[in-house]
Regions:
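Nucleotide-state-sensitive switch-loop elements of NTP-binding domains
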Residues: 2-8, 13, 17-127
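Helical mechanochemical/support elements of P-loop NTPase systems and associated helical scaffolds
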Residues: 3, 68, 97, 136, ...
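A generic alpha-helix structural signal
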Residues: 23, 36, 76, 102, ...
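Short, aromatic/basic amphipathic alpha-helical patches
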Residues: 47-50, 160-163, 305-313
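Short, solvent-exposed amphipathic alpha-helical segments in soluble enzyme
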Residues: 49-51, 105-107, 134, 248-249, ...
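Phosphate/Mg2+-binding loops and adjacent switch elements
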Residues: 78, 82-191, 195
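C-terminal accessory "lid"/substrate-recognition subdomains
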Residues: 142, 151-289, 299-300, 313-323
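Flexible loop/N-cap segments at domain edges
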Residues: 295
Length: 323
């Protein structure tokens, strides 16, 4: 399954700079596709990214920048078929909302790891009453406060309060159930146009998850930084509702869950993708390894142990796994 991130935010907040810095810093060893969904006929940001990624192309053996104004899904399909990227970043127009892009990516079977809204800490006051800006924040589950070096601590705290207030009021909801699409959200800060690494930790491809499932007798590993990744194996005699109940009780310290599980009431194994409260499922053919769930977060040992105590079909081996 291809992973993706959607980058949204109002006009001039620094999306392109952040995206450029992010890919160069964290994904130079990956095959990355950049999709710029521009507003209007001329895409200046697309030209900037094309120049940057012509250099990354030589390093990572394949980074594609494609500017799409129309026929978004067909354009993304063309990228997938032609280049087979590992990760896709979509930068939306500053004048558009992110959720239609989110739905399109899911329709294409692409795992959306996060919808990131870049907020201009210095200039939020000047655009926070704009309805598009409000729905950009409401339709995201990761808010990144940019240009924090240009404001005081008091001003930054005021920005955080504004963002939280907008998020709570405009948090996008399921029209049928009235429940929020994103149960949880996080607020991060960018320094010098670079977002923190934790936003992107825990991005697993299916083959990596299968590799971990095969490796369940592996020796102890140490984890990087403060991000902990813990693996649980699931007993065979469970139903989909059991897995769903686990995901509904995930604490905020755990911001990603990946895995492949076999349940009695679904014919094929299910791929789980949980990211900051948002959950998606996809069936997977010909999976013969143990059912596995990978929990990723910050200082999560105690929370994962509590989950295993609450749900006796979760078994926690005594080792840690790092990417």
């Amino acid at each position: 399954m291809i992973q993706s991130f959607i980058i949204t935010g109002f006009l001039g907040v620094g999306k392109t700079t952040m995206l450029t810095n992010t890919v160069q810093k964290y994904f130079s060893d990956k095959k990355v596709a950049i999709v710029v969904n521009e507003f209007g006929d001329i895409g200046i940001d697309g030209n900037i990214l094309s120049n940057v990624y012509s250099e990354v192309l030589e390093i990572s053996e394949g980074c594609i920048c494609c500017q799409l104004a129309e026929e978004f899904e067909s354009g993304v399909l063309e990228i997938m078929n032609k280049y087979n990227p590992e990760i896709i970043f979509v930068e939306t127009s500053g004048a558009s909302e992110p959720f239609p892009i989110f739905l399109s990516m899911q329709n294409l079977g692409i795992s959306v790891e996060g919808v990131i809204c870049v907020v201009d800490s210095q200039n939020l006051d000047s655009y926070k009453d704009n309805s598009t800006a409000k729905y950009q924040i409401g339709g995201s589950n990761i808010m990144v406060l940019n240009k924090t070096d240009l404001v005081s601590n008091d001003e930054l705290e005021a920005v955080k309060k504004d963002v939280i207030a907008i998020k709570e009021e405009y948090n996008i909801k399921n029209t049928l159930t009235g429940e929020p699409i994103f149960n949880n959200y996080v607020i991060n800060q960018a320094e010098q146009g670079l977002v923190s690494k934790e936003v992107f930790d825990g991005v697993y491809r299916i083959d990596e998850i299968i590799g971990l499932a095969k490796d369940y007798k592996h020796h102890d590993h140490t984890t990087k930084d403060s991000i902990t990744q813990k693996v649980a194996y699931l007993k065979a005699d469970i139903e989909f509702a059991d897995v769903d109940e686990v995901l509904k009780t995930i604490p905020k310290s755990i911001y990603r869950v990946k895995g492949v599980v076999k349940v009695k009431d679904v014919p094929n194994p299910i791929v789980i993708n949980y990211s900051f409260g948002n959950v998606s499922f996809e069936e997977l053919d010909e999976y013969t390894q143990p059912s596995i769930m990978i929990f990723i977060g910050e200082s999560i040992d105690n929370d994962v142990n509590l989950l295993c105590e609450k749900f006796d079909f979760l078994n926690m081996p005594k080792f840690r796994v790092s990417k």
